[in-house]
Regions:
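Bacterial N-terminal signal peptides that target proteins for export
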Residues: 1-8
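Bacterial N-terminal signal peptides
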Residues: 9-16
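Sec/Tat signal peptide C-region and signal peptidase I cleavage site
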Residues: 17-22
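Extended soluble regions of mature proteins
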Residues: 24-252
Length: 252
């Protein structure tokens, strides 16, 4: 088992990405809920929900990722258990290996107000802090213009909805097109979104929607966790701890 962990850790460090799949360097696209996506929520700035993201890449491979999401005034928190992900790109034993190393549970926090993000691994009691470099993520609401076209009425998960085509244009002239199902019994919350992000076609479904404000503490990393200045540093040190138990770095 220790050899398997070493192989997986090496792949992580070489790719610089987590999690690891049968094709190294590929990771599921997680939706960005800021920038043009935030315009799809209208005036709703605080909510929590369970979320299922279905993404299809250019080769036709489909990934389904369940998660929990919390949003408050532009801040976003996503909690994901990789063991629950369904994907043809995930090797059969990768999920179990990630769980054994404390890597299966991930929390991603985006703080546009601070221009930073956190990647947190509760199983490791560690997190990496990274600068938010995506211009769209830190753009203001005034940087986007919205055009809408109503497409009809529909029902999603028991909620009566208005189906609407959104075209959001940013201040650089780039257009982002989405189809949105706004639930009329949830203050027009978008319980279903179809869009394209990072070159992948996405369908995002929201359930158990709660429009109460989440606790502000959810958008901070735990003070007791070890902080790292990059994902690579965190992965390297955590893998050495879990594999070595005092072995130290492998010889060059």
């Amino acid at each position: 088992m220790k050899n398997n962990h070493l192989i997986l850790a090496s792949a992580i460090l070489c790719a610089g990405l987590v999690p690891v799949y049968s094709q190294p360097g590929r990771a599921p696209a997680m939706p960005k809920m800021s920038g043009h996506m935030a315009k799809l929520f209208g005036g709703i700035s605080a909510y929590s929900a369970t979320m299922e993201t279905q993404s299809k890449d250019s080769s036709g491979d489909t990934t389904t990722m369940p998660s929990k999401i919390f949003c408050l005034d532009g801040k976003t928190r996503m909690e994901t258990d990789m063991a629950k992900m369904k994907s043809g790109n995930l090797s059969p034993d990768a999920a179990e290996q990630m769980k054994a190393m404390g890597m299966n549970s991930m929390v991603m926090i985006s703080r546009p107000d601070k221009k930073i993000s956190y990647m947190i691994y509760p199983g490791m009691q560690a997190y990496a802090e990274n600068p938010l470099q995506d211009r769209e993520t830190t753009a203001s609401a005034a940087d986007f213009k919205v055009e809408t076209t109503e497409l009809g009425k529909d029902t999603v998960d028991g909620h009566p909805c208005v189906k609407t085509k959104f075209i959001v244009t940013d201040d650089q002239g780039a257009k982002h097109e989405s189809v949105v199902w706004n639930a009329t019994d949830l203050k027009k919350f978008p319980v279903k979104i179809e869009t394209v992000q990072q070159g992948q076609t996405m369908t995002i479904l929201f359930k158990d929607v709660n429009l109460a404000k989440p606790d502000a503490g959810l958008f901070e990393p735990p003070s007791s966790y070890t902080k790292y200045d990059s994902m690579q540093t965190m992965m390297r040190e955590q893998m050495m701890k879990r594999m070595g138990g005092g072995m130290g770095m492998p010889p060059h």
